[in-house]
Amino acid sequence: MEKSALVYVGLTVVTVFLGIFVKNTEFVPRYIRGGGRYGESRCATRQQAANRAASFGVYCLLAGVSACRIAVGNDYWVYRDNFKLIAQNRHVSSEIGFNFIVKLFQDLFGYDNYLPIFAFFSLVTVFFYVRALEDQGSYYAFSLFLLMTGGYYFNSLNSVRYYLALAVALFSMKYVLRGEYEKFVLWVLAGAFIHKSILLVIPVYLAARFLASARLKKWHYILGGGFLCSLIFCQGLYREIIFFFYPYYRNSVFDNGHLSYVNILKCVCVLILCAICYKRSLGEDVMNRFYFFLNLFGLVVYCCGSFIPEVSRVGYYMIISQIFLLPRLLAQMEKGWLRRLAYAGVAGAFGMYFILLLREMYAVDIRLLPYLNWIFN
């Protein structure tokens, strides 16, 4: 493994260590119920100050590594070429909001000055990730560990537009949980100016929130079964809807009918853990139930949505909620050997996934390693 991989390993270790100093267990439930982010008191307590300081440190490290990169990612130079086309007012397939920002930055910093553009999107993407952890991460350090080892941060060095939209979607979950649906829709619409795929989360997150607070009846299961059947028998209709928004995906390399077995396995394992913890953690806990239904939706998409181009990206909008659900389930389990085994299993599985991810980062279609930055390279 190349030495620059130690940058990613060290970043994960140091940020998770900083995350240990963030104690959010009491603040998150209050915030989701409508309270302040760090409690009700306007005068910061010592713990609130520690939370802010540690979280700011996490942000600086994550943003720094991302913003200072150069030639990292298989689409880095593709984006650079698109930046030039945008500055020339040529047609590109990216959304109007993204194009506006790119053109503005080149007007300010000069034609083909691409480093500030990548840095800006890095700073914004990491901001939404960290704010989501602050607002919803009852167990901040563990959620951060899952975010890092699950690849959501490192993959944001690729596919800049998509991962910014994913970070906005993660951030916007809190508004669904708080019942502030207008804010949720506005944030999603803002994200759609960067990547239209985020529009998917409006019906998906609202459906998960409805089911989380409802007592399931027979008609819920009938509707669910009907939707499942539609994914099997109405694939042509769904494909036409997708190609209306993304016509260049038709018959492209992304339209390959690929099944993501790793993500299917992740969803199945999470749902098994949910079944084990149902009485203690899912019965009346709306947050946990919301995340549970998102993972259930993700499993359905991965199992029945192979006709969707880039199906993994569609599913990520749902299964990224695992970074909040798993720590809550594990913490609420009764102390004993089963809890210790579950902690070890989750940490070990994500750790192994991270190791495999590091090995794959050298692949031509990923190219996240070697890590280069414009300061030293």
What are these regions (language model features)?
Residues V72, W77-R80, V92, N99, ...:
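Alpha-helical transmembrane segments and terminal signal-anchor/GPI-anchor hydrophobic tails
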Residues V130-T149:
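Transmembrane-helix signature of polytopic, membrane-embedded enzymes
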Residues W77-Y111:
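Short hydrophobic/aromatic helix or loop-helix immediately within or flanking a transmembrane segment
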Residues I96, G110-V124:
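Loop-to-helix entry region of an early transmembrane alpha helix in multi-pass inner-membrane enzymes
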Residues L157-Y163:
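Short acidic/glycine- and proline-prone juxtamembrane loop motifs at membrane-interface regions
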Residues F27-N51:
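Membrane-interfacial, low-structure loops and terminal tails that flank and connect transmembrane helices
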Residues A169-E182:
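Membrane-interface transmembrane helices that cradle and orient dolichyl/undecaprenyl
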Residues Y152, K183-A207, L299-C303:
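Membrane-interface alpha helices of multi-pass inner-membrane proteins
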